[in-house]
């Protein structure tokens, strides 16, 4: 099935299928719901306006994920330069009324520490972590998005997890 940008019917199908995934990517790079929605909207406008033919739905999906990832990273870099900190973009998890207070505090602290550590990873490692853990892409899909080999994705993922683990160990963070 061929998908041509500018085709309203194809656009609607792509939007319905791909929006949840790109929204996860944008949110887990920016940690801001409104910004993530704006980034996704911008990416879909570019998709619609761009004169590109995609051989399949997957090709359109990977193109959109790549655009959203780049827009989100650029947004964060811009904000970091302006504020010199990602901390205000990181929201803690919502309180679960079924957990006791101590468990909730530990979970919130652990989640904040992991997010902080992920934000401090080099971009090539942070990107594979976000695409795998938050966008739920498999290694071959990540390879297509990043235009690298699947084995390179595995190497980056291994190094990212190793570096993330070392960062959390240095901070003495126990992840439940």
Language-model segments: which ranges?
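A short pre-motif secondary-structure segment
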Residues: 128-132
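DNA-recognition helix of helix-turn-helix
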Residues: 69, 73, 140, 145-170
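Internal acidic/polar
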Residues: 74, 82-111, 138
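A short, charge-rich alpha-helical start-of-domain segment used by transcription regulators
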Residues: 1-24
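Short amphipathic alpha-helical boundary/capping segments
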Residues: 1-2, 113-121
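C-terminal flanking helix
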Residues: 19, 23, 44, 122, ...
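Arg/Lys-rich amphipathic alpha helix in sigma70-family domain 2
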Residues: 55, 66-87, 107, 159
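Structural recognition of an alpha-helix C-terminal capping motif at a helix-to-coil junction
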Residues: 38-45, 49, 58-70
């Amino acid at each position: 099935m061929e998908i041509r940008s500018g085709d309203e019917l194809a656009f609607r199908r792509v939007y319905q299928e791909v929006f949840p995934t790109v929204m996860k990517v944008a949110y887990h790079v920016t940690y801001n719901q409104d910004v993530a929605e704006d980034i996704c909207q911008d990416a879909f406008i570019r998709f619609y306006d761009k004169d590109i033919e995609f051989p399949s739905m997957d090709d359109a999906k990977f193109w959109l994920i790549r655009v959203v990832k780049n827009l989100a990273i650029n947004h964060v870099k811009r904000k970091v330069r302006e504020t010199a900190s990602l901390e205000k973009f990181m929201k803690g998890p919502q309180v679960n009324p079924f957990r006791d207070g101590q468990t909730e505090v530990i979970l919130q602290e652990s989640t904040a520490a992991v997010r902080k550590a992920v934000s401090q990873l080099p971009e090539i490692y942070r990107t594979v972590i976000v695409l795998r853990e938050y966008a739920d892409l498999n290694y071959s899909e990540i390879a297509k998005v990043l235009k690298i080999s699947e084995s390179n994705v595995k190497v980056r993922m291994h190094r990212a997890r190793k570096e993330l683990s070392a960062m959390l160990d240095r901070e003495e963070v126990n992840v439940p």
